[in-house]
Amino acid sequence: PKATPPFSGRIDRLLEGSEARRLEAPSVPEKAPNILLVMLDDVGFGSFSSFGGPVESPGFQSVANNGLLYNQFHTTALCSPTRAALLTGRQHHSVHMGGITEIANSFPGYDSQIPAEAATVAQILQMSGYGTSCFGKWHLTPSWEQGPAGPYDRWPTGMGFDRFYGIIGAEASHWEPAAYDQTTPISPHINRPDYHLTEDLADQAINWMERHRVSAPDRPWFCYFSTPA
């Protein structure tokens, strides 16, 4: 986190001789872009039509046609380590996520407790004035901290995300998920016979983007959309 700036005003014995420091809201660079980061669970990049695979993905293809495709990269092929590396920009062992949270132990690099000094991209953008959100699978909270009683320091809302809606652990039913809205447990499938988690996540993300656009049109947003398998 940023250090608290020194007081730049003046404090005199009397109010009339004192000068308050001007408080400024975080500002973003002019024309800062909105950012949508999509993370898909348990899928290889070669599955998509964009890379010659059998799964038709016209949306991704449209993005690729107007952007870049990469085919050389490193992945851990595991949930928590990949997510930790993606969100912090650091090698997964250096942020204590050598394995999934369910197999955490006390050896260095494996306790599944991302240190405070390893800021997430959401925290950096949040401090820079962005609105931030996470929809979907998190799987970065130590397993003993995943209950509704917290602590919430390593939940999305404690790691730079203003808004969280999804599942906190490794997996959940797509039809009857044990989900969370911020840190409150919910059962979104109740009285909804056609409920499906991925569709719900997409609707929630779109609604959040629309609310943000209307209420804070001058602030860009960062949305981390991470569907579970």
Task: Describe the role of every protein-language-model region.
Residues 1-229:
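Formylglycine-dependent sulfatase
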